[in-house]
Swiss-Prot record:
Protein name: Mediator of RNA polymerase II transcription subunit 30
Keyword list, A-Z: Acetylation, Activator, Coiled coil, Nucleus, Transcription, Transcription regulation
Low complexity bias: start-end ranges: 10-20
InterPro entries to which the protein is assigned, alphabetical: Mediator_Med30_met (IPR021019)
The organism of origin for this protein: Bos taurus (Bovine)
Coiled-coil portions: 71-93
GO molecular function: transcription coregulator activity
Main location, first listed in the record: nucleus
């Protein structure tokens, strides 16, 4: 089996020869580095499981005659796994350092800012957001309750509190009136008066 001739022997250099190849090798995608790191972690877990399997199968020297060949074989496997494990940890550290180096210039963005809002009116006051949403939701529930009337036509059907619709009036209801939306209370007062 012969080796391929080098570029110095008269053949044109390949497309990845020279400074472009070195620059391409240096600029590795961070996502591919993370994938390599994930595979390295999986290899570490696999090697560690094999080490524990070897240790579990070893017998303690309790005065039992131990075959020298078996002992040497298991010891060699254990040392090989430990050596490979230390190499994998070094590789993982290099990948970790390279990922941190690539992401070093990026400012961490809070997770709350990554959530897209459907309706943004341009206001930057974060404290005004949740009460506005709650008041809109309350208004929608009040409109739905205002237009829903049960089969008798005398009381609004409270779909939020299904057990209260079986009662003849709100006087016997166990729900405090403060828990019922204002529009339902007002419509109930109009019906009862």
């Amino acid at each position: 089996m012969s080796t391929p001739p080098l570029a110095a022997s008269g053949m044109a250099p390949g497309p990845f020869a020279g400074p472009q190849a070195q620059q391409a090798a240096r600029e590795v995608n961070t996502a591919s580095l993370c994938r390599i790191g994930q595979e390295t972690v999986q290899d570490i877990v696999y090697r560690t499981m094999e080490i524990f399997q070897l240790l579990r199968n070893m017998q303690l020297p309790n005065g039992v005659t131990y075959h020298t060949g078996t002992y040497q074989d298991r010891l060699a496997k254990l040392q090989d796994h430990l050596r490979q494990l230390s190499i994998l940890f070094r590789k993982l550290r290099l990948v970790y350092d390279k990922c941190n180096e690539n992401c070093g210039g990026m400012d961490p963005i809070p997770v709350e800012q990554l959530i897209p809002y459907v309706e943004e009116d341009g206001s930057k006051d974060d404290r005004a957001g949740p009460p506005r949403f709650a008041s809109e939701e309350r208004r929608e529930i009040a409109e739905v309750n205002k237009f829903q009337v049960n089969s008798k036509g005398t009381q609004p059907y409270l779909h939020m509190y299904p057990f209260s619709s079986k009662l003849p009036s709100h006087s016997g209801c166990r729900i405090p009136l403060s828990r019922i939306p204002c529009a339902v209370q007002n419509s109930n007062r109009r019906i009862n008066s």
